[in-house]
């Protein structure tokens, strides 16, 4: 089961964080081809702990202060995976979880802007309303990125 999540880079901790979108979100609604989406309210999106959000299907690392192990980012509107096609992000995050040298937070941010948000911006979508899908991580699959598909299907 996939869950809707917002992605945020935390430069103070040099980690990539997910912000779960709770069903109780009462932000400004956004109408699109998939229906009405709401931006998260402060109470619905917490950086501390997400147990109160009652989301199902998230791996144990989703609410970790270190961020998730690996992500599969998908445009919720067109379901087109852009980052996973290059196989860069899963390898980078895998190295970071092992404490190995990897892409810096600044480089990750540039990567997201260049490879992920660019296409969506050209389609006229608002970055602040981007919704992502978490597909899987090392808590679901026990293998190395080089020997298997790092993600489960969302």
UniProtKB/Swiss-Prot annotation:
Pfam families membership: X
Alphabetically ordered keywords of this record: Activation of host NF-kappa-B by virus, Activator, Apoptosis, Host cytoplasm, Host G2/M cell cycle arrest by virus, Host mitochondrion, Host nucleus, Host-virus interaction, Modulation of host cell cycle by virus, Transcription, Transcription regulation
Region (Mitochondrial targeting sequence): 68-117
GO cellular component, as recorded: host cell mitochondrion; host cell nucleus
Biological processes, Gene Ontology terms: DNA-templated transcription; symbiont-mediated activation of host NF-kappaB cascade; symbiont-mediated arrest of host cell cycle during G2/M transition; viral genome replication
PTM text: A fraction may be phosphorylated in insect cells and HepG2 cells, a human hepatoblastoma cell line. Phosphorylated in vitro by host protein kinase C or mitogen-activated protein kinase. N-acetylated in insect cells.
Cystine bridges: none
Compartments reported by the entry: Host cytoplasm; Host nucleus; Host mitochondrion
InterPro entries in UniProt: Transactivation_prot_X
Primary localization: host cell
Entry function: Multifunctional protein that plays a role in silencing host antiviral defenses and promoting viral transcription. Does not seem to be essential for HBV infection. May be directly involved in development of cirrhosis and liver cancer (hepatocellular carcinoma). Most of cytosolic activities involve modulation of cytosolic calcium. The effect on apoptosis is controversial depending on the cell types in which the studies have been conducted. May induce apoptosis by localizing in mitochondria and causing loss of mitochondrial membrane potential.
Protein family: Belongs to the orthohepadnavirus protein X family.
The protein's assembly and partners: May form homodimer. May interact with host CEBPA, CFLAR, CREB1, DDB1, E4F1, HBXIP, HSPD1/HSP60, NFKBIA, POLR2E and SMAD4. Interacts with host SMC5-SMC6 complex and induces its degradation. Interacts with host TRPC4AP; leading to prevent ubiquitination of TRPC4AP. Interacts with host PLSCR1; this interaction promotes ubiquitination and degradation of HBx and impairs HBx-mediated cell proliferation.
Name the UniProt record assigns to this protein: Protein X
